[in-house]
């Protein structure tokens, strides 16, 4: 396990690294506790906990960056707090208030300040808030007790083919990420467990990950592994898929604003047919972990589509997003939460 002294900040990858403190709050008798920081990273759970048998678990992911002045900056944490609430509602779990969510994130960052990546190192401090159903239980029903936990780890690029490395390669999969009217639009653990096999098959074929198509017709682009998709057309329009089974990415939502307001591009959120790929000169995967990863190739039904990686617009969006996240450029209202 890497320790702070031997971390190579510029080549971290995306893996678990134990840091000093995490925040834990408990839900009992109808309310959340105030929560506290603890140093122990192991949990003791009842063998009957619904999270272990029925997947009653949801989570979030957000990043803190170090600014040039040394401040810790969280990117759009209120959006993550709201999305976690939506996920909790879907699984009949008690919602975590925005206040408790922000408090937990801030305390974890302050307690693990030494793990915050240096300015412009290419790394960041990734926060993983999650809620799980615990306690003695056997039947298929909501838990009576819950844990809300936030831990953190320093991370680098999620995909190997990042913005500086020529882009990533993807292949469509016949597997479905989510069912119609299922849980695709929320961030619950079961969605990701179900994706492991498709990811394994894609990587064994030499690709970075797979692209999921819509579960009804298998003709429309949904998600790119654990990230959202966007494409740049030959006439410079920013297009991203619309579907109730796509997780609403905070990064994608932000890119739509930046593309429209800063780059003055036409922005569309609509269904994208897989056969439309030839209309794009650039394509990318976006999300908290992926940030913006340019796509250089998509394989589908023995046909291959190639894209500029990174293309000019993708690079502009990446630079603009990162400059806001690192405090170099003024951010839209409520996008940046300064800690400490």
From Swiss-Prot:
Signal peptide start-end: none
GO molecular function: L-isoleucine-2-oxoglutarate transaminase activity; L-leucine-2-oxoglutarate transaminase activity; L-valine-2-oxoglutarate transaminase activity
Involved pathway(s): Amino-acid biosynthesis; L-isoleucine biosynthesis; L-isoleucine from 2-oxobutanoate: step 4/4; Amino-acid biosynthesis; L-leucine biosynthesis; L-leucine from 3-methyl-2-oxobutanoate: step 4/4; Amino-acid biosynthesis; L-valine biosynthesis; L-valine from pyruvate: step 4/4
Reactions that this protein is recorded to catalyse: L-leucine + 2-oxoglutarate = 4-methyl-2-oxopentanoate + L-glutamate; L-isoleucine + 2-oxoglutarate = (S)-3-methyl-2-oxopentanoate + L-glutamate; L-valine + 2-oxoglutarate = 3-methyl-2-oxobutanoate + L-glutamate
Keyword terms of this UniProt record: Amino-acid biosynthesis, Aminotransferase, Branched-chain amino acid biosynthesis, Pyridoxal phosphate, Transferase
Main EC class the enzyme belongs to: transferase
Gene Ontology BP terms: isoleucine biosynthetic process; L-leucine biosynthetic process; L-valine biosynthetic process
EC nos: 2.6.1.42
Keyword Transferase found: yes
Residue positions where N6-(pyridoxal phosphate)lysine is found in the record: 187
Cofactors required: pyridoxal 5'-phosphate
SUPFAM superfamilies assigned: D-aminoacid aminotransferase-like PLP-dependent enzymes
Family: Belongs to the class-IV pyridoxal-phosphate-dependent aminotransferase family.
Function: Acts on leucine, isoleucine and valine.
Record-given protein name: Branched-chain-amino-acid aminotransferase
């Amino acid at each position: 396990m890497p320790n702070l002294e031997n971390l190579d900040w510029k080549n971290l990858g995306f893996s678990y690294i134990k840091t000093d403190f995490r925040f834990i709050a408990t839900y009992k008798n109808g309310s959340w506790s105030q929560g506290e920081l603890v140093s122990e990273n192991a949990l003791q759970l009842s063998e009957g906990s619904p999270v272990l048998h029925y997947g009653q678990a949801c989570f979030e992911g957000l990043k803190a960056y170090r600014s040039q002045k040394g401040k810790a900056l969280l990117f759009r944490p209120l959006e993550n707090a709201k999305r976690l609430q939506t996920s909790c509602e879907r699984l009949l779990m008690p919602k975590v208030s925005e206040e408790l969510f922000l408090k937990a994130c801030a305390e974890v960052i302050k307690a693990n300040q030494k793990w915050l990546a240096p300015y412009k190192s290419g790394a960041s401090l990734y926060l993983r808030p999650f809620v799980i159903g615990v306690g003695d239980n056997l039947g298929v029903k909501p838990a009576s007790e819950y844990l809300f936990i936030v831990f953190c780890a320093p991370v680098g690029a999620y995909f190997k083919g990042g913005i500086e490395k020529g882009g990533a390669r993807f292949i469509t999969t016949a597997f479905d990420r989510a069912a119609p009217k299922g849980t695709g639009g929320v961030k619950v653990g079961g969605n990701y467990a179900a994706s492991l096999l498709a990811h394994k098959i894609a990587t064994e074929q030499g690709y970075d990950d797979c692209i999921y198509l819509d579960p009804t017709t298998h003709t429309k682009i949904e998600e790119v592994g654990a990230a959202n998709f966007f494409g740049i057309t030959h006439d410079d329009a920013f297009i991203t898929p619309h579907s109730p089974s796509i997780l609403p990415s905070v990064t994608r939502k932000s890119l739509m604003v930046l593309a429209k307001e800063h780059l003055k591009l036409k922005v569309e959120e609509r269904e994208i047919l897989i056969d439309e790929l030839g209309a794009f000169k650039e394509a990318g995967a976006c999300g908290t972990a992926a940030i913006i990863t340019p796509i250089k190739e998509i394989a589908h039904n023995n046909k291959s589509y190639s894209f500029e990686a990174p293309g000019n617009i993708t690079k502009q969006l990446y630079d603009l997003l990162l400059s806001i996240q690192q405090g170099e450029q003024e951010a839209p209202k409520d996008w940046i939460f300064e800690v400490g």
